[in-house]
């Protein structure tokens, strides 16, 4: 069972340090825990979580080893500072920064080749679900990926991210079944996971953990979700 906290564009180095010091004190044995700070806070998190079982991952990674790609960071650069992995293809990257299935596939491949652990995100928009296109969208997004021991997928129904909406257990179960039928890797749920719904979501047999957004920003709520995973 894996619980990953995606901090998005929150928490600079000082707030990251405070959070990581608090997280170190928590008893979270029995699950894998990953925090995903912004680029400027990665080194602080790596330093303060060294010697624990808590891993640090980035929120994005480029497919080239180096080059004239202003604003990007390579897998090798992340590895050099001790970063364990990266999120790739989050819906906000697709929506605001023009990520496509093709570029997501390239980023995932490069990160895996460099030895990073990857959380690759897939999921449909509300419009796509309303049109009955969920299965087609998921199949298309998964088609650029291949099984790997260092790859997990996160199903994030886009309409549930940051909206307070959550897929019903049946919706999540159906989506996870489809994903697992296409790619034999663990699948996390990632749509407005919070302490109030974590136990129900994580109790489903085909849910292998959670990619947590807003609820990962507060130590109390993040650790509550982690404990729900421990007891699931």
Question: Which residues are covered by each model-predicted region?
Answer:
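Active-site loop-to-helix "anion-binding N-cap" substructures in soluble metabolic enzymes
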Residues: 1-232
């Amino acid at each position: 069972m894996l619980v990953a906290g995606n901090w998005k564009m929150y928490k600079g180095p000082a707030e990251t340090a405070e959070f990581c010091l608090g997280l170190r004190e928590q008893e979270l044995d029995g699950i894998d825990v990953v925090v995903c700070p912004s680029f400027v806070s990665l080194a602080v998190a790596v330093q303060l979580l060294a010697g624990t079982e808590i891993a640090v991952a980035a929120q994005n990674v480029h497919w080239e080893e180096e080059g004239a790609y202003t604003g990007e960071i390579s897998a090798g650069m992340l590895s050099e500072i001790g970063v364990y992995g990266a999120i790739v293809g989050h819906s906000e990257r697709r929506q605001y920064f023009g990520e496509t299935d093709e570029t997501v596939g390239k980023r995932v491949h490069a990160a895996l080749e460099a030895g990073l652990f990857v959380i690759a995100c897939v999921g449909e928009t509300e419009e796509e679900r309303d049109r009955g296109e969920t299965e087609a969208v998921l199949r298309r997004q998964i088609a650029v990926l291949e099984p790997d021991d260092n790859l997990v997928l996160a199903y994030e129904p886009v309409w549930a991210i940051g909206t307070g909406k959550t897929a019903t257990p049946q919706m999540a179960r159906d989506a996870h079944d489809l994903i697992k039928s296409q790619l034999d890797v663990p699948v996390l749920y990632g749509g407005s996971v919070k302490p109030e719904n974590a136990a129900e979501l994580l109790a489903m047999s085909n849910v292998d953990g959670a990619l947590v957004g807003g609820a990962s920003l507060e130590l109390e709520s993040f650790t509550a979700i982690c404990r729900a995973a421990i007891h699931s």
